[in-house]
Regions:
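Sec-dependent bacterial lipoprotein signal peptides
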Residues: 1-32
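Short, surface-exposed linear motifs at loops/turns and structural transition points
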Residues: 33-238
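Boundary/junction segments of secreted and surface-exposed precursor proteins
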Residues: 143, 238-253
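Structural signature of tandem-repeat unit edges
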Residues: 240-242, 261-268, 286-319, 330-343, ...
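A structural signal for leucine-rich repeat
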Residues: 277-281, 310-314, 370-372, 495, ...
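Consensus positions within tandem repeat domains that build extended binding/scaffold surfaces
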Residues: 323-325, 345-348, 425-427, 446-449, ...
Length: 556
């Protein structure tokens, strides 16, 4: 009986343990079966995240998306709006495997917006959580630092930048200014041409005191208030500085004809050069003006292409003093050319009756003379110029062998440098020198060298063989001429219209000449002029063609 009881207990224990084992196996099988039955395509898990980079009108919307299984990335967008309906959409762009963003613009300032991330595969739409952000409020305008663009003795052009309108339309902008000695007494000048745009602004302040120090503040106004920028200091002076070409007339304003002396720096285009001519007494249509500018220093100026013609037909060229640029400027007496000048064209200063001095810069490589500068007394040249030199106010080439430009107003007597070997055409035309002495090494003269000059007496080079055509034509004050021993020929009109009283000829044989060589209009020099010839040569000259017309051939 006892054994049976023990046996019964053991069987119950075995049965219980077997049942538990079977249950565990069944559970494992069941779990395994559930995992293998999980679907391959699941809805993405999307989350709306906080907005960033929020301004008055823009914001960046952020979100995340988690893809499970073999689900493809759906099409995603952000819905947003000022109500929970969120009627506006913006395409979301994936920045990595899980993050998406969208930059939205055109928002209203100080406004709360609702937004959420939304995904769709064309059949099903999944929405994320809804969030909000608030745009920044509008502000007063923001300004950059002011600067001086250009200035004159009584005016200044100020430049400044409106960097931000603050989200509101700017209603007014300009500058405040005051004498530094009384900074609280500020004058306000509003821009009359303001377009309403942000960015670079310029403003002219005129009617300033000469040689005075000012404080200048830029300002801008909107519905949100007025912003006044940091002040800059500016002192007026006698010089004018252009930051941009074409501003000379604007800077001068009503004082255009008030200046007699002026220094100008900066770029000058055709518009500026036309204005400069007007200041010197010559208008755009070549008529006289009330301009009185007589002394101008352009050392720090720079001639640049652009603008309208400076004289009605000719345009400015970079670093070129063009033909007619200063022509007929009746007020001009002295000019220093821009230091970067490379070319001075023919007749750039034509018919400037009071121009006395011209300064040639180091950079000049080509200089041509101007006619009609009756008062021109001297031409100076920078010592650094490698193409020209100035000697006694006369412009010569670099090795001083050729005269380039002889100033018409130079008076008295003049002896040419011994280095000069030739003289070009019309070199002394219309000049005021009364007595000329040539070095004997000059062998050639150009045509019309002394035409219409005021010379009274001249000694020709001893080695000169030919007196060219029109050499002294129109020299109505020429009375005495000395011809060298090697003179062989006197060309037609060489002494035409010259009231000669004495001709000295050192040549043993009479130079070839004809009646036209001494052709005159008026006085008959053949009966009044004395011809002085070498001793023992009187009869030879009296028998020679051309010379025999003279009634007074003598020997000293």
């Amino acid at each position: 009986m006892a054994w049976r009881n023990v046996l019964s207990i053991s069987l119950r224990q075995i049965t219980s343990r077997l049942s538990w084992s079977l249950c565990v196996v069944a559970l494992v099988v069941s779990l395994s079966s559930c995992d293998s039955d999980k679907p391959d395509n699941l809805e993405p898990l999307i989350t709306t995240l906080s907005a960033t980079d929020i301004t008055r009108t823009d914001a960046t919307l952020n979100g995340s998306v988690v893809i499970e299984g073999e689900t493809e990335m759906p099409q995603m967008c952000f819905r947003y709006g000022i109500t929970e309906e969120m009627k506006q959409t913006a395409t979301a762009v994936s920045s990595d495997n899980s993050s998406v963003t969208a930059r939205i613009t055109g928002l209203s300032s100080a406004t709360t917006y609702y937004y959420m991330l939304e995904a769709t595969n064309g059949r099903t739409t999944v929405k994320g959580n809804m969030m909000t952000f608030t745009t920044l409020p509008n502000e007063k305008p923001s300004l950059g630092e002011a600067s001086i663009v250009s200035h004159g003795p009584m005016s200044v052009i100020v430049g400044y930048e409106i960097t931000d309108d603050g989200g509101e339309a700017i209603t007014e902008t300009g500058c405040l200014y005051a004498l530094a000695s009384d900074a609280e007494d500020r004058q306000r000048v509003a821009s009359k041409d303001y377009s309403g745009d942000k960015g670079r602004q310029t403003l002219l302040l005129s009617g300033l005191n000469r040689n005075a120090t000012y404080l200048i503040w830029p300002y801008a106004k909107s519905r949100m208030g007025e912003t006044v920028g940091s002040p800059i200091t500016f002192t007026t002076g006698d010089a004018m500085s252009l930051g941009e070409a074409g501003q000379l007339r604007l800077l001068l304003g009503k004082e255009l004809y008030d200046y007699t002396k002026l220094s100008i720096a900066g770029p000058l285009n055709g518009d500026d050069l036309c204005c400069l001519r007007e200041m010197m007494g010559r208008g755009f249509d070549n008529t006289a003006t009330a301009g009185r500018l007589s002394d101008v220093d352009l050392t720090d100026a720079r001639i640049v292409a652009g603008g309208e013609p400076y004289d009605g037909s000719r345009y400015a060229v970079d670093n070129v003093v063009g033909q007619g640029l200063f022509a007929d400027c009746a007020s001009l007496t002295k000019v220093v050319l821009p230091s970067g000048t490379t070319t001075i064209e023919k007749d750039a200063f034509a018919r400037c009756p009071y121009l006395q001095n011209i300064s040639i810069p180091a950079s000049a490589t080509l200089v041509l003379p101007s006619a009609g500068c009756s008062a021109l007394q001297g031409i100076s040249v920078s010592g650094a110029n490698s193409h020209y030199i100035g000697k006694d106010g006369v412009l010569l080439n670099a090795d001083a062998t050729r005269i380039v430009w002889f100033p018409m107003g130079k008076s008295g007597s003049y002896t040419l440098p011994s280095t000069v070997t030739s003289i070009g055409d019309y070199a002394f035309k219309e000049c005021s020198i009364e007595t000329f002495t040539f070095p004997d090494n000059i062998t050639t003269l150009g045509t019309g060298v002394f035409m219409n000059s005021k010379v009274k007496e001249v000694k020709m080079p001893g080695s000169l063989r030919l007196v060219p055509t029109a050499t002294f034509q129109g020299c109505t004050q020429l009375y005495v001429v000395r011809l060298g021993s090697k003179t062989e020929m006197i060309s037609d009109y060489a002494f035409s219209a010259c009231p000669l009283t004495d001709i000295y000829v050192d040549a043993q044989l009479p130079p070839v000449c004809k009646s036209l060589s001494f052709g005159t209009s008026g006085a008959n020099i053949f009966s009044s002029c004395r011809v002085h010839v070498p001793k023992g040569r009187v009869n030879i000259y009296k028998a020679s063609e051309g010379w025999k017309l003279f009634k007074n051939i003598i020997t000293d």
